[in-house]
């Protein structure tokens, strides 16, 4: 009888150890997939990037920024500001991409009848958007307090 109790205790201990391990992820998440370093991939990524912005899906937009741009405003503040004070939706058409200065790729697009240019870089296996080069006016706005930001854009808050 004592032997059965000892075996049951050992089995219970082993089972609880297995259960504890099972509570975590079975497989570790892999590193982010690398983007192909091609113009076609960049055009596709830039199109998704602009479509996400137009639909108000701001998190993935911020996630595509380079480190210098992400240092301008936190992800949470970026999402909050755009959710509370959204831009008017505009149809954006990504048109072309070409190599630019200093390793940049310049993506040309049209928004509301205006031709614009964004700067993208290939860093660490990913295409990243450079807000500082592409839209320095937004950088100035993001550095304002939330109250100043709302007042500057004239949106209701």
Predicted regions located by residue number:
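Surface-exposed, charged secondary-structure patches
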Residues: 79-126, 131-138
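C-terminal motif of bacterial Sec signal peptides marking the signal peptidase cleavage site
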Residues: 14-17
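Bacterial signal peptide processing site
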Residues: 19-21
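Bacterial N-terminal signal peptides that target proteins for export
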Residues: 1-6
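Low-complexity, intrinsically disordered terminal/linker segments enriched in charged
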Residues: 130-157
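Ser/Thr/Pro/Gly-rich low-complexity linker/stalk segments immediately outside membranes or between
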Residues: 23-31
């Amino acid at each position: 009888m004592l032997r059965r109790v000892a075996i049951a205790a050992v089995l219970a201990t082993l089972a609880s150890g297995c259960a504890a391990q099972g509570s975590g992820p079975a497989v570790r998440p892999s590193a982010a997939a690398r983007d192909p370093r091609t113009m076609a991939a960049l055009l596709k990524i830039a199109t998704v990037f602009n479509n996400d912005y137009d639909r108000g899906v701001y998190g993935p937009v911020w996630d595509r920024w380079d480190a210098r741009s992400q240092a301008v405003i936190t992800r949470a503040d970026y999402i909050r500001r755009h959710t509370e004070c959204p831009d008017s939706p505009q149809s954006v058409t990504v048109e072309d991409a070409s190599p630019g200065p200093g390793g940049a790729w310049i993506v040309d697009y049209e928004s509301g009848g205006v031709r614009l240019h964004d700067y993208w870089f290939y860093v660490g296996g990913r295409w990243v958007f450079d807000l500082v080069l592409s839209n320095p006016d937004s950088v100035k706005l993001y550095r304002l307090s939330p109250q100043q930001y709302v007042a500057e854009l004239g949106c209701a808050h």
